[in-house]
Regions:
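Acidic anion/phosphate-binding donor-loop and adjacent secondary structure
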Residues: 63-65, 151-155, 165-183
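Aromatic "clamp/platform" in nucleotide-sugar-dependent glycosyltransferases that forms part
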Residues: 251, 270
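Short hydrophobic beta-strand element within catalytic cores of glycosyltransferases
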Residues: 287-290
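Conserved acidic donor-binding segment of nucleotide-sugar-dependent glycosyltransferases
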Residues: 302-303, 307-314, 323-328
Length: 360
């Protein structure tokens, strides 16, 4: 089967990580290509992590923002590629023209990587009537990534979707030294890591407020934030929190090694789909401390394989951090994380997608 995964870029992020993992796994048995609409840069972390067996293409876009000419570039690339399946991961407006003209001879699959309403924002919201029509006429096969994502999709589009949880490959260490050691202020310091772009969804202002509260209460903790500066307004709000115990690292290429070396993983999001960073955390026994949104409660049971706050507020999250610090059976929680991960391995997920690709 000739398969194309296409996306605006392969920079750091959960969707890009998922595309990389799927493409690498599928390329073991099928002819797989990945196309980046933007020209790859050194920051395109997952472009450089694609297997040599994956064919890589880019459309050379460099200017920010949406341009109509990209629609025609994408159409011509897909039309000439003779693909059996084109797998889209959001940003429908880029692909609408291709879907309507090519759906009779190419199978289009669309993964909704978040809440269906949140996912259809910006330009996708302008295209929403066309998107609804394409889904309802079965021009595209929809896939959702959690029960909550599936529920939101059904509510918005009034049709069903196939549920396939995200997955990742087992951990293979790249670092040769402890990536966290330099951030421990004392031998007892607990180091927490939050990998995520600076954005409304990831709720970093609340995260920093919660950590400031427990630091002010005398807790020996350090928070590391690793991710791109997507929202400059939120970035400015974070400036007062930076200190020797709340540290912004920028984008990192070694997030999974850092998760392996850290004590806990933080994700106080306002909304989510099925966070790939959460799966990366449990795969290495990094205890997750999360808000109960999206597909997170479908992975984490509070006190068993992680900790869930009651909501996404600073007060609730600070209390959950305290619950983690007071936990007396963290080694068992870590072991439970790694056991949970067995259900989210990319080998299983890829087989489920390949089955969807073959559906009539």
């Amino acid at each position: 089967m000739k398969i194309l995964h296409i996306h605006p870029s392969m920079n750091g992020g959960g969707i890009e990580s998922m595309i990389c993992s799927l493409a690498n796994e599928m390329s073991k048995t099928d002819d797989v290509s990945v196309c980046s609409i933007f020209a790859p840069t050194d920051e395109a972390v997952f472009w450089h992590k694609l297997s040599p067996s994956v064919k890589k293409f880019d459309l050379g876009k460099t200017a920010p923002g949406f341009s109509v000419k990209e629609i025609f570039k994408i159409y011509n690339f897909i039309r000439r590629g003779n693909f059996d399946v084109v797998h889209i991961h959001g940003f429908f407006y880029y692909y609408a023209f291709s879907v309507f003209l090519l759906h009779r001879r190419i199978r289009f699959v669309y993964t909704i990587h978040s809440d269906a309403v949140k996912e259809s924002s910006g330009w996708d919201h302008k295209f929403l009537p066309i998107k609804i029509f394409a889904f309802r006429k079965a021009f595209i096969k929809p896939v959702t990534i959690s029960k909550e994502s599936k529920r939101s999709f059904t509510a918005l589009y009034n049709i069903e979707s196939t549920l396939i949880y995200n997955g990742i490959a087992p951990y293979e260490r790249k670092a040769t030294t402890d990536t966290i050691a330099d951030y421990r202020i004392t031998p007892q310091t607990k180091v927490f890591i939050h990998p995520g772009r600076i954005s409304e969804a990831k709720n970093q202002v609340v995260l920093c407020k919660a950590f400031k509260a427990i630091i002010d209460a005398g807790k020996d903790v350090v928070l590391l934030i690793a991710g791109s500066r997507q929202d400059e307004v939120i970035w400015e709000k974070l400036q007062p929190y930076w200190s020797d115990r709340i540290i912004y690292l920028g984008e990192r290429k070694d997030v999974r090694d850092m998760l392996h070396d850290a004590d806990a993983f933080c994700l106080p999001s306002i909304w989510e789909g099925m966070p790939v960073t959460l799966l990366e955390a449990i795969s290495v026994g990094c205890v997750p401390i999360c808000s109960p949104v999206g597909g997170i409660p479908e992975v984490i049971t509070n006190g068993v394989n992680g900790f869930l706050s009651t909501d996404s507020s600073a007060e609730a999250y600070a209390q959950t951090l305290t619950n983690y610090l007071n936990c007396e059976n963290l080694e068992q929680v870590k072991a439970n994380c790694e056991e949970t991960f067995k259900e989210f391995q990319i080998s299983k997920v890829a087989l489920q997608y390949l089955s969807v690709y073959k559906e009539k």
